[in-house]
């Protein structure tokens, strides 16, 4: 692996993050609860991380603004269009995950 500059590393990380968001956007059928069950993070977690990192750098971005970035639209609109009710199985798996 070749050496990268700090700037190149930041650019690569940013591009990777954009690809992750694009991948999640193209796979809206993957529900947040499924992500939480399998990986212990979801789109909302990414939004919280985004807002936190922005605030640590003095950028005034709140949670709702961060969710707009991650979801590519207002969260309420995304939820209405793409979020399905959680099944009993999903809720049970989520409870097991919390323990």
Language-model-detected regions and their locations in the chain:
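Domain-level signature for proteins that mediate thiol-based redox and metal-cofactor handling
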Residues: 2-99
């Amino acid at each position: 692996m070749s050496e990268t500059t700090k700037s190149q590393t930041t650019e690569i990380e940013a591009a990777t993050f954009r690809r992750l968001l694009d991948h999640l956007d193209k796979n809206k059928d993957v529900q947040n609860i499924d992500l939480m069950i399998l990986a212990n993070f979801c789109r909302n977690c990414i939004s919280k991380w985004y807002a936190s990192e922005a605030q640590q750098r003095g950028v005034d971005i709140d949670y709702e603004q961060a969710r707009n970035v991650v979801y590519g639209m207002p969260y309420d609109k995304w939820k209405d269009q793409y979020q399905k009710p959680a099944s009993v199985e999903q809720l049970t798996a989520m409870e097991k995950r919390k323990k």
